Swiss-Prot record:
DNA-binding annotation, residue ranges on this chain: 27-47
Alphabetically ordered keywords of this record: Autocatalytic cleavage, DNA damage, DNA repair, DNA replication, DNA-binding, Hydrolase, Repressor, SOS response, Transcription, Transcription regulation
Lineage: Bacteria, Pseudomonadati, Pseudomonadota, Gammaproteobacteria, Lysobacterales
Root EC class: hydrolase
GO cellular component terms given for this protein: protein-DNA complex
Gene3D superfamilies associated with the record: Umud Fragment, subunit A (2.10.109.10), Winged helix-like DNA-binding domain superfamily/Winged helix DNA-binding domain (1.10.10.10)
Pfam families (UniProt xref): LexA_DNA_bind (PF01726), Peptidase_S24 (PF00717)
Subunit composition and interactions: Homodimer.
Name of the gene encoding the protein in the UniProt record: lexA1
Family: Belongs to the peptidase S24 family.
UniProt cross-references to SUPFAM superfamilies, sorted A to Z: LexA/Signal peptidase, Winged helix' DNA-binding domain
Descriptive protein name: LexA repressor 1
Reactions that this protein is recorded to catalyse: Hydrolysis of Ala-|-Gly bond in repressor LexA
A Gene Ontology biological process term: DNA repair
Gene Ontology terms, MF aspect: DNA-binding transcription repressor activity; sequence-specific DNA binding; serine-type endopeptidase activity
Record organism: Xanthomonas campestris pv. campestris (strain ATCC 33913 / DSM 3586 / NCPPB 528 / LMG 568 / P 25)
Length: 201
């Protein structure tokens, strides 16, 4: 499986877990589970897995995918996409269940609880680009220097945390953006810590 892309490995793990549960998902169900725009994208991954000998396809059957092995219970994560997070000027809270994606656990350094879609370019020097989906682990605390998702006066942003004796600053990773200095009377909370990202497309 070393030669598989992260997305293709996640599709294989999904099929293995479904097989363990006695299920054989259709292409439409695979596309829905991974947020693919069409059945064709699911077909591409399934066909590649079959050509690699990792699954078997039974001709002329809607649910004709056979999987020889099974995945461990922690190989896949079902993560909700809960809206957008600003990598730039903070944006108003846009938290609500958008969709759910199945992702390979190995994509993330920490185990995330949910995903947010990045809007803006303030974190590009950390490799976080507009449109990326970032994994977030719920936490009300973080270490100095960690990338956090923070709420400032009702708005949400992703930045590096810098705490000193007299101030909290949220640091961008793009010289075109200024740090956010959190006022003493601001409604400030750390919502979670950054776990990693996936780039769609």
């Amino acid at each position: 499986m070393d030669s598989l892309s992260p997305k293709r490995a996640a599709v294989l793990a999904f099929l293995q877990q479904q097989a363990q549960a006695g299920l054989a998902p259709s292409l439409a169900e695979i596309a829905q589970a991974f947020g693919f725009a069409s059945r064709n994208a699911a077909q591409k991954h399934v066909q590649a897995l079959a050509e690699a000998g990792l699954i078997e396809l039974v001709p002329n059957r809607k649910r004709g995918i056979r999987v020889p092995g099974g995945a461990g219970p922690d190989a896949l994560l079902a993560l909700p996409v809960l809206g957008r997070v600003a990598a730039g000027v903070p944006i108003g809270a846009d938290i609500g269940l958008d969709r759910q994606l199945w992702l390979d656990r190995s994509l993330f350094a920490l185990r995330p609880d949910y995903l947010l879609q990045v809007q803006g370019d303030s974190m590009i020097d950390d490799g976080i680009l507009e449109g990326d989906l970032v994994g977030v682990q719920r936490s009300s605390d973080a270490r100095n220097g960690q990338i956090v998702v923070a709420r400032v006066d009702g708005e949400i942003t992703i930045k590096r945390l810098e705490r000193s004796a007299d101030a909290i600053r949220l640091l961008p990773r793009n010289p075109a953006h200024a740090p956010i200095v959190v006022a003493a009377d601001a409604d400030f909370a750390i919502e979670g810590v950054y776990c990693g990202l996936i780039r769609q497309g």
